[in-house]
Amino acid sequence: NGALALARLAVPDGATEEQVEKVFRNFKGLYGEFGLSLTSEFEGMTETLKELHARGKKLGIMSNKFEGGVKDVEAKFFPGLFDVSHGETDTIPRKPDPDGLLLCAREMGLEPARCAYFGDSHTDLIAAHNAGMLAVGVTWGYQPLETLKTGSPDVLIDAPVDILQFA
Protein backbone atom coordinates (compact mmCIF):
# COMPACT_ATOMS: atom_id res chain seq x y z
CA ASN A 1 0.00 0.00 0.00
CA GLY A 2 1.90 3.05 -1.26
CA ALA A 3 4.98 3.52 -3.41
CA LEU A 4 7.45 2.90 -0.59
CA ALA A 5 5.79 -0.46 0.10
CA LEU A 6 6.11 -1.23 -3.62
CA ALA A 7 9.82 -0.39 -3.47
CA ARG A 8 10.22 -2.80 -0.54
CA LEU A 9 8.64 -5.56 -2.63
CA ALA A 10 10.98 -4.80 -5.54
CA VAL A 11 14.23 -5.42 -3.65
CA PRO A 12 15.63 -8.81 -2.64
CA ASP A 13 15.19 -10.12 0.89
CA GLY A 14 17.87 -8.72 3.14
CA ALA A 15 18.13 -5.38 1.31
CA THR A 16 19.10 -2.48 3.53
CA GLU A 17 16.80 0.46 4.21
CA GLU A 18 19.27 2.59 2.23
CA GLN A 19 18.82 0.31 -0.80
CA VAL A 20 15.03 0.47 -0.45
CA GLU A 21 15.21 4.28 -0.28
CA LYS A 22 17.35 4.36 -3.43
CA VAL A 23 14.80 2.24 -5.33
CA PHE A 24 12.02 4.50 -4.02
CA ARG A 25 13.84 7.67 -5.17
CA ASN A 26 14.40 6.14 -8.61
CA PHE A 27 10.72 5.17 -8.81
CA LYS A 28 9.62 8.70 -7.94
CA GLY A 29 11.94 10.09 -10.60
CA LEU A 30 10.55 7.76 -13.25
CA TYR A 31 6.93 8.23 -12.20
CA GLY A 32 6.75 11.77 -13.51
CA GLU A 33 8.15 10.62 -16.84
CA PHE A 34 6.27 7.35 -17.33
CA GLY A 35 3.70 6.85 -14.56
CA LEU A 36 1.20 9.44 -15.72
CA SER A 37 1.18 8.05 -19.25
CA LEU A 38 0.08 4.71 -17.78
CA THR A 39 -2.51 6.25 -15.44
CA SER A 40 -6.14 6.83 -16.29
CA GLU A 41 -9.11 8.08 -14.33
CA PHE A 42 -12.06 5.89 -13.43
CA GLU A 43 -14.97 6.29 -15.85
CA GLY A 44 -17.35 8.99 -14.66
CA MET A 45 -15.00 10.41 -12.03
CA THR A 46 -14.34 13.78 -13.68
CA GLU A 47 -18.03 14.42 -14.28
CA THR A 48 -18.85 13.51 -10.67
CA LEU A 49 -16.12 15.75 -9.27
CA LYS A 50 -17.20 18.65 -11.49
CA GLU A 51 -20.77 18.28 -10.24
CA LEU A 52 -19.63 18.22 -6.60
CA HIS A 53 -17.47 21.28 -7.23
CA ALA A 54 -20.42 23.06 -8.87
CA ARG A 55 -22.52 22.30 -5.79
CA GLY A 56 -19.89 24.04 -3.66
CA LYS A 57 -18.71 20.89 -1.88
CA LYS A 58 -15.23 20.91 -0.42
CA LEU A 59 -13.08 18.18 -1.89
CA GLY A 60 -9.77 16.77 -0.75
CA ILE A 61 -7.35 14.02 -1.64
CA MET A 62 -5.38 11.99 0.89
CA SER A 63 -3.40 9.21 -0.72
CA ASN A 64 -0.68 6.77 0.26
CA LYS A 65 0.96 7.68 -3.05
CA PHE A 66 3.95 9.97 -2.57
CA GLU A 67 3.02 13.65 -2.52
CA GLY A 68 4.58 14.51 -5.90
CA GLY A 69 2.63 11.71 -7.58
CA VAL A 70 -0.62 12.95 -6.05
CA LYS A 71 0.01 16.48 -7.31
CA ASP A 72 0.86 15.16 -10.80
CA VAL A 73 -2.35 13.10 -11.06
CA GLU A 74 -4.45 15.98 -9.72
CA ALA A 75 -2.95 18.46 -12.19
CA LYS A 76 -3.40 16.15 -15.19
CA PHE A 77 -6.90 14.81 -14.53
CA PHE A 78 -8.64 17.11 -12.05
CA PRO A 79 -7.20 20.64 -12.23
CA GLY A 80 -8.98 23.14 -10.02
CA LEU A 81 -11.44 20.63 -8.53
CA PHE A 82 -9.81 19.92 -5.16
CA ASP A 83 -9.45 22.28 -2.22
CA VAL A 84 -6.57 20.29 -0.71
CA SER A 85 -4.47 17.32 -1.72
CA HIS A 86 -1.79 15.38 0.07
CA GLY A 87 0.21 12.22 -0.28
CA GLU A 88 2.69 10.48 1.92
CA THR A 89 5.55 12.71 3.11
CA ASP A 90 8.06 12.67 5.94
CA THR A 91 5.48 14.51 8.06
CA ILE A 92 2.27 12.84 6.84
CA PRO A 93 2.18 9.13 7.70
CA ARG A 94 0.54 6.52 5.53
CA LYS A 95 -3.01 5.39 6.14
CA PRO A 96 -4.47 3.82 8.25
CA ASP A 97 -2.94 6.57 10.40
CA PRO A 98 -5.65 9.27 10.45
CA ASP A 99 -3.28 12.27 10.56
CA GLY A 100 -3.47 12.98 6.82
CA LEU A 101 -7.27 12.87 6.78
CA LEU A 102 -7.43 15.11 9.84
CA LEU A 103 -4.99 17.55 8.19
CA CYS A 104 -7.20 17.74 5.08
CA ALA A 105 -10.30 18.39 7.20
CA ARG A 106 -8.50 21.15 9.15
CA GLU A 107 -7.23 22.78 5.97
CA MET A 108 -10.78 22.84 4.59
CA GLY A 109 -12.21 24.14 7.87
CA LEU A 110 -14.34 21.04 8.42
CA GLU A 111 -15.10 18.93 11.47
CA PRO A 112 -14.12 15.29 10.78
CA ALA A 113 -17.57 14.06 11.85
CA ARG A 114 -19.04 16.06 8.93
CA CYS A 115 -16.68 14.45 6.40
CA ALA A 116 -17.01 11.34 4.26
CA TYR A 117 -13.86 9.59 3.09
CA PHE A 118 -14.15 7.46 -0.04
CA GLY A 119 -11.59 4.69 -0.33
CA ASP A 120 -10.82 1.64 -2.41
CA SER A 121 -8.78 -0.20 0.23
CA HIS A 122 -9.37 -1.52 3.71
CA THR A 123 -6.63 0.80 5.03
CA ASP A 124 -8.56 3.78 3.62
CA LEU A 125 -11.64 2.73 5.55
CA ILE A 126 -9.72 2.09 8.76
CA ALA A 127 -8.16 5.55 8.43
CA ALA A 128 -11.62 7.10 7.98
CA HIS A 129 -12.88 5.36 11.12
CA ASN A 130 -9.73 6.41 13.01
CA ALA A 131 -10.36 10.02 11.93
CA GLY A 132 -14.02 9.94 12.97
CA MET A 133 -15.26 10.24 9.38
CA LEU A 134 -17.90 8.32 7.45
CA ALA A 135 -16.05 5.41 5.78
CA VAL A 136 -17.37 4.85 2.24
CA GLY A 137 -15.93 1.88 0.39
CA VAL A 138 -15.76 2.12 -3.39
CA THR A 139 -15.97 -1.21 -5.21
CA TRP A 140 -14.43 -0.03 -8.49
CA GLY A 141 -10.90 0.24 -7.10
CA TYR A 142 -7.96 -2.09 -6.91
CA GLN A 143 -8.79 -4.22 -3.89
CA PRO A 144 -11.09 -7.24 -4.00
CA LEU A 145 -14.46 -6.64 -2.35
CA GLU A 146 -13.86 -9.17 0.43
CA THR A 147 -10.60 -7.43 1.39
CA LEU A 148 -12.28 -4.01 1.20
CA LYS A 149 -14.97 -5.24 3.60
CA THR A 150 -12.32 -6.00 6.26
CA GLY A 151 -12.09 -2.21 6.72
CA SER A 152 -15.72 -2.20 7.97
CA PRO A 153 -17.19 0.31 5.51
CA ASP A 154 -20.18 2.29 6.73
CA VAL A 155 -21.44 2.23 3.14
CA LEU A 156 -20.36 0.57 -0.13
CA ILE A 157 -20.90 2.23 -3.51
CA ASP A 158 -20.38 0.82 -6.99
CA ALA A 159 -19.73 3.79 -9.30
CA PRO A 160 -18.34 7.33 -9.06
CA VAL A 161 -21.78 8.82 -9.76
CA ASP A 162 -22.96 7.19 -6.51
CA ILE A 163 -20.82 9.73 -4.63
CA LEU A 164 -23.42 12.39 -5.47
CA GLN A 165 -25.88 10.87 -2.99
CA PHE A 166 -23.65 12.20 -0.19
CA ALA A 167 -23.67 15.80 -1.47
Regions found by a protein language model. Give the residues of each.
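N-terminal helical cap/lid subdomain that shapes the substrate entry/recognition surface
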Residues: 1-47, 51-55, 68-71
